[in-house]
Regions:
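Glycine-rich phosphate/pyrophosphate-handling loop used in enzymes and phosphotransfer proteins
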Residues: 1-167, 171-201
Length: 201
């Protein structure tokens, strides 16, 4: 609806997570915390139009928004995709109960679309969310990390594979870190992420 107003995040941005920054190489969060993933980026800043857009996509089933998001990921992350050379695209899973409630897994929908555009293998079931956790929205960074301990389980062979994790929004990185840790414990190579949006802080 407001596609023309949207601008992807340009430079300077954090070398690790891709958050917009004013100077330097890393955002404050990546200076303070050692993340489990290698690198990643979000395409748009999570505010205003995009916050409303993602809410409609996630909670009201507006899948046409997902089509636009996946096209934007493919269009604006060409350089990263070439550099990262992922072998497999994997979405952040949601617990069964949440998927029933929403009617779909919004990250899995994005992953499948991106896989179609890129030709990269996609597996939406290889990581499962086995614990029903509290919503991350109202938790601080430490609580988010604790909340996700042992939440994910890898059900297939990821040994030696470079993995691209897909989600809708990156805030503190705790979800991506939990996913990356789980994948690496099962022998995955490098883990990267792409999200539709990323917070400023």
């Amino acid at each position: 609806e407001c596609e023309k107003e949207l601008r992807p995040i340009g430079h300077p941005r954090c070398y690790k997570c891709g958050k917009p920054i004013e100077t330097g190489e890393y955002c404050r969060d990546c200076q303070k915390h050692r993340h489990m993933y290698e690198q990643g980026r979000g395409i748009f800043v999570y505010d205003g139009i995009m916050r409303r857009s993602v809410t409609r996509y996630k909670y009201y089933g507006c899948r046409e928004y997902g089509d636009f998001y996946a096209r934007a990921m493919y269009r604006y992350a060409q350089k990263e995709l070439r550099e990262w050379k992922p072998d497999l695209i994997v979405p952040v899973p949601v617990h069964r109960s949440k998927e029933r409630q929403r009617g779909f897994n919004q990250a899995a929908y994005l992953a499948e679309k991106l896989g179609h555009y890129t030709g990269i293998s996609t597996d939406v079931n290889i990581v499962q969310k086995v614990l029903k956790t509290k919503s991350q929205k109202k938790l601080n960074a430490l609580q988010r990390r604790k909340n996700l301990e042992k939440a994910f389980c890898v059900t297939g062979d990821v040994r030696g594979k470079n993995i691209l994790v897909i989600d809708d929004v990156y805030t503190t990185g705790s979800t991506i870190d939990a996913m990356a840790g789980c994948l690496k414990r099962k022998g995955a190579g490098n883990v990267y992420f792409l999200t539709v949006c990323i917070g400023r802080r």
